[in-house]
Amino acid sequence: MSTSIQSFLGNQYKTYLVLFLCALIIGIKLGTLIPLLSLILESRGYSNTQIGLNVVAQPLAVILFVRITPLIIHKIGLARSIVIAQIFTILLYFTFPIFESLTAWFFIRFLIGFAGALAWNAFDTWMLSMADDSNRGKIVTIYNTVFVIGFAIGPMVI
């Protein structure tokens, strides 16, 4: 690793690189899931309104559960929260082909939103706990930029 990257990110640069890689992967995952599921629903003949309401399930869960996720993180820890949320999300992805009902997909997406809220809070807590006053702004900027890049890459994967 070059010393310029290490000096820019600080002593914990390897941990930050892992964090940024996770942000990229989660961005790609979300950026792929939203349009892919919408295209599948459209091919099944659902209206744009029905598809839009289905898409709302994930952010709705984030809004409803973001206040309790810190309690879960405190109880089971940062690393476990991240791992459990990601495993839960991956398992939920495999349920889409099993259930064809729009209502079932709403609940699956809602649960993915809950897991996303847990992971989001855990990642943000991890990132902010590592950053100090001298690099916090840089770290948050890189983290969010990498996430958005992943989100932009997602539709290109389809």
Residue ranges, per PLM feature:
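Helix-loop boundary and gating motifs at the non-cytosolic
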Residues: 11-59
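Small-residue-rich transmembrane alpha-helices and their cytosolic helix-loop interfaces
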Residues: 55, 59, 140-148
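Residue-level signature of mid-helix packing/kink "hotspots" within the transmembrane helices
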Residues: 59-67, 151-152
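Helix-to-loop junctions at the C-terminal end of transmembrane segments
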Residues: 65-77
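Helix-breaking motifs and short loop linkers at transmembrane-helix boundaries and internal kinks
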Residues: 77, 98-100
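Structural signature of the two symmetry-related core transmembrane helices
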Residues: 80-94
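Paired small-residue
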Residues: 103-111
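Intracellular juxtamembrane helix-capping segments at the cytosolic ends
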Residues: 118-131
